Swiss-Prot record:
Pfam families: CypI (PF06646). GO terms for cellular component: plasma membrane. A lipid is attached at C27 (N-palmitoyl cysteine). Its main location: membrane. NCBIfam families: MG289_thiam_LP. Keywords: Cell membrane, Lipoprotein, Membrane, Palmitate, Signal, Transport. It is a lipid-anchor. This is High affinity transport system protein p37. Residues 1-26 form the signal peptide. It comes from Mycoplasma pneumoniae (strain ATCC 29342 / M129 / Subtype 1) (Mycoplasmoides pneumoniae). P37 is part of a high-affinity transport system. Residues 285-304 are annotated as: Disordered. A lipid is attached at C27 (S-diacylglycerol cysteine). It is found in: Cell membrane.
Length: 380
C-alpha cells in the first residue's frame, strides 16, 4: 500500500507538467503534406495553370523544407470559398472584399492582398470626401475620347489581346478598383445632367434614366449606390428603393451599350470597362458609341450621331481580392503560402495571377489598417 501511495504522489507531482503538454498537442495546428486552394479562373486560362501549381508546390516545399503538394478547385463564388475555408474543405482562397465585409473581418486570417495594374489618372486610394473622384473622371474622359472608341485600332491604342495598354500606367500597381457613372447625350443634355449632379437634385438626375447591373455587382450597382447616398443625402432613397418606386426610370443596361436607348442617359459600370473591351471595327453598332437608331430600327431613329459619352465620376474604391487562409494551419504554413505567391510574381513566374487580373501581391501585416479602414471609408 505504501509503495502504491508513493507512486501516486510521484504521478501527481509531475501532473502539472503533463497537462500543458497534452493541451499543447491537442491545440497544435496542422502542417499537412497536401493543401487545397479554392481559386477563380478566367475562361481563357488553360492547362498552364496546373503547371503553375506544380511550380508553386515545389517552391512551397523548399520554403517549408518538406514535401507539400497543392491541388486547386475552381470556384467563382466568394461566399462558397469562405464556407469551404471555415469547414476545412479548403486551406486557402482568394475572395472579394465584399464577402469579407459581409462576414466580418474578425472571422478571417487575411494574409495576402492582390494588386492590379493602375489606370492612368487613378493611382491613389482617394475617396469621395477627398473631392478628387470627379476630376479623375474628367481626365480619363479626355484620354478616352481623344479618338472615338469606334475608331480604336489594335496598334494605335496598343491592344494586347486582353486590354488597351495606352490607358494604363507603366509599372504601377494598386490594390483597389472602382465603379464609374457614364453619361451620354448632346452637349446640352450632358450639361444639364452635370448640373443636376452638382446641385444635388436627385429627382432631376434620376429623370434622365439610369442603367445598372445586378444587385450583386460591386461596380455596376453597390459602389454607385454608396456614392449616391453620400452625394445626394436624404433626398436619395437608395438604389433598390428608387428602382421599385420609379421602375420606368431604370433599366438593366451594360456600360458598353450606353447610347442605344434614348430613355437611359446614365449608366453604372466597372471603372474604365472600355479598357478591356475590344473594338470590332466591322460592328454595326459599336460599343460606347451612341447609335443613330438606338439599335431598334429605322422607326425609332434619332439625332444621336453627334452625342457624346463621358465619365461623370468614379466611385469610392473597393479593395481588390484578398487571400484568406485556414486558421487550422500553423503560422509558418500561413506565412509561407503568402510569401510564395509574392516571390513568384516578383520573378515573373506567376502564370495564374495575370490570367485573372492579379499582377502582384502584398503581404498583409495589419488587417485593421490595410483592410478594415478602407472598407469603412467606402461603406461609411
Amino acid at each position: 500500500m505504501l509503495k502504491r501511495k508513493k507512486l501516486l504522489q510521484g504521478f501527481l507531482k509531475f501532473l502539472p507538467l503533463i497537462i500543458p503538454a497534452t493541451i499543447f498537442v491537442s491545440c497544435a495546428r496542422r502542417e499537412s503534406n497536401h493543401l487545397i486552394f479554392n481559386i477563380s479562373l478566367d475562361h481563357d486560362a488553360d492547362a498552364s495553370i496546373s503547371k503553375f501549381f506544380e511550380l508553386y508546390s515545389n517552391n512551397l516545399s523548399k520554403k517549408l523544407d518538406k514535401k507539400v503538394t497543392v491541388s486547386f478547385n475552381i470556384i467563382d463564388d466568394s461566399f462558397t470559398k469562405i464556407s469551404n475555408i471555415q469547414t476545412a474543405k479548403a486551406d486557402f482562397a482568394f475572395v472579394n472584399s465584399q464577402s469579407i465585409k459581409d462576414n466580418g473581418i474578425e472571422e478571417f486570417n487575411l494574409i495576402l492582398q492582390t494588386q492590379t495594374d493602375a489606370f492612368k489618372e487613378d493611382t491613389n486610394l482617394d475617396y469621395y470626401s477627398d473631392g478628387q473622384l470627379k476630376s479623375k473622371a474628367e481626365k480619363m474622359t479626355t484620354l478616352f475620347s481623344k479618338t472615338p472608341y469606334k475608331d480604336w485600332e489594335d496598334t494605335a491604342q496598343q491592344w494586347t489581346g486582353s486590354r488597351y495598354n495606352f490607358l494604363y500606367e507603366t509599372n504601377k500597381l494598386i490594390n483597389f478598383y472602382r465603379g464609374m457613372i457614364l453619361i451620354t447625350g448632346s452637349e446640352e443634355e450632358i450639361k444639364k445632367i452635370k448640373e443636376a449632379w452638382d446641385q444635388k437634385k436627385w429627382s432631376d438626375f434620376m429623370n434622365y434614366g439610369i442603367g445598372h447591373g445586378s444587385s450583386g455587382s460591386a461596380g455596376k450597382f453597390q459602389l454607385p449606390d454608396l456614392l449616391l447616398r453620400k452625394h445626394f443625402g436624404s433626398s436619395y432613397p437608395g438604389l433598390q428603393n428608387a428602382i421599385n418606386q420609379n421602375p420606368d426610370k431604370f433599366a438593366n443596361v451594360r456600360g458598353r451599350e450606353i447610347g442605344r436607348d434614348n430613355k437611359i442617359k446614365i449608366v453604372f459600370d466597372d471603372a474604365n470597362s472600355f479598357a478591356w473591351t475590344h473594338n470590332d471595327k466591322n460592328a454595326t453598332n459599336h460599343f460606347y458609341t451612341p447609335t443613330e437608331n438606338n439599335g431598334k430600327g429605322d422607326s425609332e431613329k434619332s439625332n444621336n450621331k453627334n452625342n457624346k459619352v463621358e465619365i461623370l465620376t468614379y466611385t469610392d474604391p473597393m479593395l481588390y481580392d484578398i487571400g484568406i487562409v485556414s486558421d487550422t494551419l500553423s503560422d509558418r504554413y500561413q506565412k509561407a503560402i503568402a510569401e510564395v505567391f509574392v516571390e513568384l510574381a516578383k520573378t515573373k513566374q506567376d502564370i495564374y495571377g495575370p490570367s485573372y487580373g492579379y499582377n502582384g501581391y502584398n503581404l498583409i501585416t495589419d488587417p485593421n489598417k490595410e483592410i478594415l479602414d478602407v472598407i469603412h471609408k467606402t461603406y461609411g
